[in-house]
């Protein structure tokens, strides 16, 4: 017992500059650990420093597009768009009626919903201008050429729209605007679309996709 006590004191003396007289120590090296153990104290491994986390640029702009969507007035779902060129935001857009006209949120009803019109069909019956369109008309032509458009759709329950896509009308405007890439948020990640693919696949402009 005497030898054990002397050994314990030796460990304490060797690590005296680190060890504090408390009942539960957090140590940073083996000397501290052994000294605590010889005194019958609990040793708690120090937490490893967490790696610095920084959101990537794509999700950064998608996050902004999601925030923009909160201004939307559509009763079905909200969409937000952000156009970026040379790492600079050119313009933003959300779903809403033309200036001076009442929004669906003001009227309290959506004609397309009341008549069970599916997404991607009969947009002439919709009061609103789409997010992509509003973003495009808010930017100068020079700023649109070669730009990237970020798009996020949000359902009424707050979840990300599962199969979000630009409608045929918005695709035509995006092509003519000279936008190079469209990035669409998905529930788990995002998808990047080369706008040239819409030009090559001409039938894509006739599909019933969109809001």
What are these regions (language model features)?
Residues 2-5, 14, 36, 67-70, ...:
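Cysteine-centered metal-binding/redox modules
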Residues 31, 35-55, 194-195:
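Secretory/periplasmic and organellar redox-cofactor proteins
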Residues 79-87, 91-92:
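Short beta-strand scaffold segments in enzyme catalytic cores
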Residues 71-74, 82-84, 140:
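Short secondary-structure boundary/capping segments within folded domains
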Residues 1-4, 24, 210-211:
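Short intrinsically disordered terminal tails
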Residues 53-77:
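Short, basic/aromatic recognition patches
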Residues 55, 63, 91-211:
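Zn2+-dependent cytidine deaminase-like catalytic core
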Residues 5-32:
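Charge- and polar-rich, low-complexity intrinsically disordered segments of small proteins and propeptides
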């Amino acid at each position: 017992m005497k030898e054990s006590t002397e050994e314990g004191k030796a460990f304490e003396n060797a690590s005296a500059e680190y060890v504090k007289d408390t009942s539960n120590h957090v140590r940073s090296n083996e000397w501290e650990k052994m000294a605590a153990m010889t005194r019958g104290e609990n040793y708690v491994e120090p937490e490893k420093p967490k790696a610095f986390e920084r959101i990537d640029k794509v999700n950064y702009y998608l996050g902004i597009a999601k925030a923009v969507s909160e201004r939307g007035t559509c009763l079905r779902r909200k969409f937000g768009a952000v156009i970026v060129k040379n790492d600079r935001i050119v313009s933003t857009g959300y779903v809403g009626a033309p200036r001076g006209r009442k929004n669906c949120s003001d009227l309290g009803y959506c004609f397309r919903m009341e008549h069970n019109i599916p997404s991607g069909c009969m947009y002439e019956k919709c009061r609103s201008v789409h997010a992509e369109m509003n973003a495009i008309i808010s930017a100068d032509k020079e700023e649109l050429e070669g730009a990237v458009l970020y798009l996020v759709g949000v359902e009424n329950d707050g979840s990300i729209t599962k199969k979000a896509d630009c409608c045929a009308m918005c695709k035509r405007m995006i092509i003519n605007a000279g936008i190079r890439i469209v990035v669409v948020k998905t529930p788990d990640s995002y998808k990047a679309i080369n706008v040239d693919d819409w030009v090559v696949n001409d039938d894509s402009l006739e599909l019933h996709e969109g809001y």
